[in-house]
Amino acid sequence: MANIKSQIKRNLTNEKRRLRNKAVKSELKTHVRRFRDAVDAGDVERAGETLRIASRKLDKAVSKGVIHANQAANKKSALARTHANLAAS
């Protein structure tokens, strides 16, 4: 446990941020999983819709500073590639 007042405040702030980031990441994983479920089911239309939502959530996570921009770009690219392969087949 910290003794310095400023560090005690930082610990509280860090805990709030950790919980907020955890919620954003959890929501992100949920939407990516929904996209993958739609792809596994072979539903092109639902996959396209969930891809848009997942991309939006990834961009939102970047703007909130939860994930790095390159990580979001890499994930969006992989999801789009998966959707394109599904639509082509």
UniProtKB/Swiss-Prot annotation:
Keywords: Ribonucleoprotein, Ribosomal protein, RNA-binding, rRNA-binding. One of its GO terms (biological process) is translation. Residues 1-22 are annotated as: Disordered. Binds directly to 16S ribosomal RNA. This is Small ribosomal subunit protein bS20. Signal peptide: none annotated. The keyword Calcium does not apply. It holds the Pfam family Ribosomal_S20p. PANTHER family: 30S RIBOSOMAL PROTEIN S20, SMALL RIBOSOMAL SUBUNIT PROTEIN BS20C. It comes from Frankia casuarinae (strain DSM 45818 / CECT 9043 / HFP020203 / CcI3). GO terms for molecular function: small ribosomal subunit rRNA binding; structural constituent of ribosome. It comes from the Bacteria. One of its GO terms (cellular component) is small ribosomal subunit. Belongs to the bacterial ribosomal protein bS20 family. Residues 1-11 have a biased composition (Polar residues). The gene is rpsT. InterPro entries: Ribosomal_bS20 (IPR002583), Ribosomal_bS20_sf (IPR036510).
